[in-house]
């Protein structure tokens, strides 16, 4: 899951800038209608030879602006929570919590477009529409994620996948999608567990 927060590879553009701009506009308009979302997910990870190397399940949620929740419940528990300012990565098995600046951690990933609305963030990616899906590729040259595909059914996000630079493809199928309720807002507030090691990587201001 940390790979979702890494920098991403530059890939060749196959379409004109005008077409890409139109596709990005359509995706942006679709996401504007999704101010918040909560869903269950099933995850399947395949390697470069299309062999399944991991399966999992959990709960996914997002809310505008800049709030994100990811709780992998199987096979091993892990949690990622972004409250709009900080991002927390919790590994219960290792009894460790990593804290990062939200903008620094998430902006380098195409996943950022799901929770960001600002022009500066969108200008960092090339978007290509393919039927009901949008392929998002970064314009950066750092290693990490090669592309993200997000797919919609009647305007509702129903699946997405993440391709990393090693050829591993993580596919996520969503179900039970609905808007965030008042009670669900607590998902975006991370409560630090007792007796865990804390690795605070936030940039300290003088």
UniProtKB/Swiss-Prot annotation:
One of its GO terms (cellular component) is outer membrane-bounded periplasmic space. GO terms for biological process: lipoprotein localization to outer membrane; lipoprotein transport. Its main location: periplasm. Keywords: Chaperone, Periplasm, Protein transport, Signal, Transport. SUPFAM superfamilies: Prokaryotic lipoproteins and lipoprotein localization factors. Pfam families: LolA. Residues 1-21 form the signal peptide. PANTHER family: OUTER-MEMBRANE LIPOPROTEIN CARRIER PROTEIN. Belongs to the LolA family. Participates in the translocation of lipoproteins from the inner membrane to the outer membrane. Only forms a complex with a lipoprotein if the residue after the N-terminal Cys is not an aspartate (The Asp acts as a targeting signal to indicate that the lipoprotein should stay in the inner membrane). This is Outer-membrane lipoprotein carrier protein.
